A protein has these predicted regions:
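C-terminal motif of bacterial Sec signal peptides marking the signal peptidase cleavage site
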Residues: 6-10
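Secondary-structure end/capping motifs
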Residues: 230-310
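Conserved C-terminal helix/tail region of periplasmic/extracytoplasmic solute-binding proteins
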Residues: 301-343
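Short, glycine-/small- and polar/acidic-enriched structural segments
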Residues: 18-164, 172, 209-214
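A ligand-binding cleft/hinge motif common to bilobed small-molecule-binding domains
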Residues: 89-102, 155, 185-205, 295, ...
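N-terminal export leaders
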Residues: 1-2
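Pocket-lining segment of extracytoplasmic ligand-binding domains
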Residues: 93, 171, 177-266
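Bacterial signal peptide processing site
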Residues: 12-15
Length: 343
């Protein structure tokens, strides 16, 4: 794999489109990729393509990149396994859940984390429910999307206060998109919602958030046999480096990111988006090493403890650090030092 320095000029978006002039995006390393190579990246809600396009990180790529949007981690995984996509962007829970169900052909090649933050997860109560504390949820209806990071945070918050999600409350399992309308209709007493949803619901009482439970892990995954294709391996390495650069761009262009993502995609005000951004910041990319793998393992362990998965899953066979040098080089070029993962 040949790595050479590359400077990409981030032009192509006007000041009106981007919320201000974009600075030059620098890419630490470029991989030599055979002509005609194509990558399809499966994402959710534009979380890969939006920063990629805003930062113009794809300028000069020696391969074709197409983004395809899916609803939920399970759909992304299915796209990878069917061959409809080469790279998938998902959260912390889907890989351990898939492994527990017998899926062994996936591997994580990129990992972001943001431990110590809420993760934008809020357990909220209906104002008319009589619920003021988590302890008040005993016997109450609590909505969450099963098999997700929100599921794990909900169970973890209840456990901290002496309650078991499976036995001490009435668990209401819903698809992610159904949680907010169900809560708004008064069909449940409490629900775990995302930051933008909290504001869209009119700022209901917050009982707890993801701090101390959330890892902020987001993963880039591939089907294992894709790593047997030298052309794809080269293209994926180059893509990952550019994805790190695009992610780091967000932190140096915070107002533009808030406007483009929180306001235009998530549908909340600039002030609300800025507050969410300032509370949690950006999940940095980390090398896949002993420390980041250990953090990922806490997710699998948490899913088992909450009963989301039946068996204990060892995540170490499902991570691959072959691109660590690319991640480290890009972070160093951008002056990014990810927070320590040591407990």
């Amino acid at each position: 794999m040949l790595l050479v320095p590359l400077l990409l000029s981030a032009c192509g978006l006007s000041d009106d489109e981007s919320g201000g002039a974009i600075d030059t995006v620098k890419i630490a390393a470029k991989t030599e990729v055979p002509a005609g190579t194509k990558l399809v990246v499966a994402e959710q809600n534009g979380t890969q393509s939006l920063p990629w396009n805003l930062a113009n990180a794809g300028q000069g790529t020696p391969y074709e990149v197409d983004f395809a949007d899916f609803s939920g981690g399970a759909a992304v995984i299915e796209a990878l396994r069917s061959g409809a996509a080469d790279v998938g962007s998902i959260g912390e829970a889907p890989v351990p859940i898939a492994v527990d169900s017998g899926v062994t052909d996936l591997v994580t090649i990129g990992l972001q984390a943001n431990p110590g933050t809420s993760g934008g997860y809020y357990l909220v109560a209906r104002p008319d429910s009589g619920v003021r504390t988590i302890e008040d949820l005993r016997g109450k209806r609590v909505a969450y999307p099963p098999g997700s990071g929100r599921h794990m945070v909900t169970a973890g918050l209840l456990k901290r206060h002496g309650l078991d999600l499976r036995t001490d409350v009435q668990p209401v399992e819903l698809a992610g998109a159904e949680v907010v309308p169900t809560f708004a209709a008064g069909a449940v007493d409490a629900a775990i919602v995302l930051g933008n949803q909290y504001y869209q619901l009119g700022e209901p009482p917050i009982l707890g958030d993801g701090k101390g439970i959330n890892t902020g892990i987001q993963t880039l995954i591939v089907r294992r046999d894709v790593l047997d294709d030298p052309a794809k391996v080269a293209a994926i390495g180059d893509y990952l480096g550019r994805a790190v650069a695009a992610n780091n761009w967000k932190d140096t262009h915070a107002d533009q990111w808030v406007d483009q993502y929180y306001v235009k995609v998530q549908g909340i005000t600039f002030e609300q988006g800025k507050k969410l951004y300032e509370e949690d910041g950006i999940a940095s990319y980390y090398p896949i090493d002993e420390q980041s793998t250990a953090l990922f393992q806490t997710v699998a362990d948490g899913l088992h403890e909450t009963g989301t998965i039946k068996g204990r899953v060892d995540v170490s066979p499902f991570v691959d650090g072959r691109y660590n040098d690319i991640v480290t080089a890009q972070n160093e070029l951008d002056g990014v030092t990810p927070k320590s993962l040591k407990s």
